[in-house]
């Protein structure tokens, strides 16, 4: 039985990396040897592996946050030629797209935000050691507005700092792509921080609101995804500035401008133009669009003309059958008719 438990824990870390482990079970995890477990997780950089070994409870929460980012990416781009489908197939950790494109910018931003969100939530729920509610938001009274800090405010700064230490640790090479990735990581975390919400509860006699107790909460991650998708649509192309004597990349500037104007901190930035994602190409992270569902009448990105890249589409017909017009008869049975509908779906050639 002990061997089966060891094997179960091992596959949780290695394959999924997305399940919470209650603090009471951590002794069993530590007993397995954090070094053994962390050395088996694919895609970790050396500094990330060190964090895993020192905080085996946190690596599972980090994995869940990274997976949440991948899921959100797939939702936001579900109607596009590139739909994030190749992300996370082997591991939720490590670099996924080799081209420094808009799509790479989005994946880095949404992953960094996902890790920060998951760590912050786990701290608030008591699922991580060494963190909890935001202590600085306890006991302060705002007399002018008639409210005070109370409850459990989400400590987003801890989550952001943990995301920064872990996610940014994979950027080892001193090149333009490193500057791009670090900027987009920070942009994703900044969007999350800016969307923190204030919730309040009234206190007073007979339902009056004499005073209010307030606390900060995390936004829904879908909201973060929508905002980052807007940032993706307005992403800024940048180029590297080599200001040191060693000619190493120092900072990024907006490419179209003659001045040394830096991008805004919440801008998503890219250094290479996106491929068209029509054909399968492992180097660009494209799985192609062959076999993808498309909308024959849509003029948008999900339309067959755009999705299929001019190759045309196949038409598939099938009959959908379901029970309908159900009525209750006394006593006591329900009688239904059988309805059917002929449906067509279209897939790219």
Swiss-Prot record:
Record PTM text: Palmitoleoylation is required for efficient binding to frizzled receptors. Depalmitoleoylation leads to Wnt signaling pathway inhibition.
GO biological process entries: canonical Wnt signaling pathway; cell fate commitment; cellular response to retinoic acid; central nervous system vasculogenesis; chemoattraction of dopaminergic neuron axon; chorio-allantoic fusion; developmental growth involved in morphogenesis; embryonic organ development
Glycoprotein among keywords: yes
Endpoints of the signal sequence: 1-24
Keyword Nucleotide-binding tagged: no
Keywords on record: Developmental protein, Disulfide bond, Extracellular matrix, Glycoprotein, Lipoprotein, Secreted, Signal, Wnt signaling pathway
Protein name (record): Protein Wnt-7b
Lineage: Eukaryota, Metazoa, Chordata, Craniata, Vertebrata
Gene from which the chain derives: WNT7B
């Amino acid at each position: 039985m002990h061997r089966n438990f060891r094997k179960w824990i091992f596959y949780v870390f290695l394959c999924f990396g997305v399940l919470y482990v209650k603090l009471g079970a951590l002794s069993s995890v530590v007993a397995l040897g954090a070094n053994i477990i962390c050395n088996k997780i694919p895609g970790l950089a050396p500094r990330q592996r060190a964090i895993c070994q020192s905080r085996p409870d946190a690596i599972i929460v980090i994995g869940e946050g990274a997976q949440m980012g991948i899921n959100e990416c797939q939702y936001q781009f579900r109607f596009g030629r590139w739909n994030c489908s190749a992300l996370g197939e082997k591991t939720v950790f490590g670099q996924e797209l080799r081209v420094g494109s808009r799509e790479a910018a989005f994946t880095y931003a949404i992953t960094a935000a996902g890790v920060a969100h998951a760590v912050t939530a786990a701290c608030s729920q008591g699922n991580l050691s060494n963190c909890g509610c935001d202590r600085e938001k306890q006991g302060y009274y705002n007399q002018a507005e008639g409210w005070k800090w109370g409850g459990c405010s989400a400590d987003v700064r801890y989550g952001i700092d943990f995301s920064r230490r872990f996610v940014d640790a994979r950027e080892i090479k001193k090149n333009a792509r490193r500057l791009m990735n670090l900027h987009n990581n920070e942009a994703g975390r900044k969007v999350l921080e800016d969307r923190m919400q204030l919730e309040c509860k009234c206190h007073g006699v007979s339902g009056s609101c004499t005073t209010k107790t307030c606390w900060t909460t995390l936004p829904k991650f879908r909201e973060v995804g929508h905002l980052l998708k807007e940032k993706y649509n307005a992403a800024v192309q940048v180029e590297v500035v080599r200001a040191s004597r060693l000619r190493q990349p120092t900072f990024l500037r907006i490419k179209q401008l003659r001045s040394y104007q830096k991008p805004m901190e919440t801008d998503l930035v890219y250094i290479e133009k996106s491929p068209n994602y029509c054909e399968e190409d492992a180097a660009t992270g494209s799985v192609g669009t062959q076999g993808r569902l498309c909308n024959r009448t849509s003029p948008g990105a999900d339309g067959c003309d755009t999705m299929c890249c001019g190759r045309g589409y196949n038409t598939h017909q099938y009959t959908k059958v379901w029970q309908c017009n159900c009525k209750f008869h006394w006593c006591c049975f329900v009688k239904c008719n059988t309805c059917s509908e002929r449906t067509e779906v279209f897939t790219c050639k």
